[in-house]
Amino acid sequence: METFKSILHEAQRIVVLTGAGMSTESGIPDFRSAGGIWTEDASRMEAMSLDYFLSYPRLFWPKFKELFQMKMSGSFEPNEGHLLLAELEKQGKQVDIFTQNIDGLHKKAGSRHVYELHGSIQTAACPACGARYDLPHLLEREVPECTAAGNNGDICGTVLKTDVVLFGDAVMHFDTLYEKLDQADLLLVIGTSLEVAPARFVPEDASLIPGMKKVIINLEPTYCDSLFDMVIHQKIGEFARSLGMKK
């Protein structure tokens, strides 16, 4: 514990990589764990693919909403782990969070520099005209459409595309992640098994940066624990509470 506090105290530029384990204590399931959305029915991956959306946009949305309806309710709240990262920023540290989660809880906790690698469930855009929409509009109808008016006054009416990165979409912000990593003095990995590319390569690449400290906080061991200076096998909310963090 004291070693971790010392590492945090010395760090001024922190890159954080978070996964599903970051939000499980907020009530959001880990999709890839036992009983998760993908492990229960692998065919769901096909329905959540870019190809499926492009081919059947009106069939896509009911399936998408069924799978993610709990997340779209907006009822989930940040846990102590999210709040800990926001607090580090308040202390004057540069904290850049790169999350594989789509729940928006880092922003809800108050963190300002959040890069959503897999997009956000809170927003969508029109593939035709680029108009953007937030959650209330997406929930108004089973299949959300663009309501923007064109130059001729006609309503666009195109089926919106979620900002969630679908299977077949490109993961976002990885160039920015490596730019920030080159400037950082601490890599903090939280709640991810590091099994999914390209995130799985980050710890190894960080090991090549002179002076970089690396800490992982994850309930289960990962294949690359040996690359880290400190390994903590604990839930992040529980660990944050042990540091005195309260909701």
Curated annotation (Swiss-Prot):
Q: Where does Zn(2+) bind?
A: 126, 129, 146, 156
What are its cofactors?
Zn(2+)
Q: Which GO terms describe its molecular function?
A: histone deacetylase activity, NAD-dependent; NAD+ binding; zinc ion binding
Q: Which GO terms describe its cellular component?
A: cytoplasm
Cellular location(s): Cytoplasm
Ordered alphabetically, the record's keywords are: Cytoplasm, Metal-binding, NAD, Transferase, Zinc
Question: Which Gene3D superfamilies does this chain map to?
Answer: SIR2/SIRT2 'Small Domain, TPP-binding domain
Q: Which reaction does it catalyse?
A: N(6)-acetyl-L-lysyl-[protein] + NAD(+) + H2O = 2''-O-acetyl-ADP-D-ribose + nicotinamide + L-lysyl-[protein]
What InterPro entries has UniProt attached to this entry?
DHS-like_NAD/FAD-binding_dom, NAD-dep_sirtuin_deacylases, Sirtuin, Sirtuin_cat_small_dom_sf, Sirtuin_class_U, Ssirtuin_cat_dom
Per UniProt, NAD(+) binds at: 20, 24, 31-32, 100, 102-103, 118, 192-193, 218, 236
Which purpose does this protein serve, as stated in its record?
A: NAD-dependent protein deacetylase which modulates the activities of several enzymes which are inactive in their acetylated form.
Q: Which family does it belong to?
A: Belongs to the sirtuin family. Class U subfamily.
The family database entries (HAMAP family) matched by this protein are listed as: Sirtuin_ClassU (MF_01968)
- Protein name listed in UniProt: NAD-dependent protein deacetylase
Q: Which organism is it from?
A: Bacillus subtilis (strain 168)
Taxonomic lineage of this organism? Bacteria, Bacillati, Bacillota, Bacilli, Bacillales
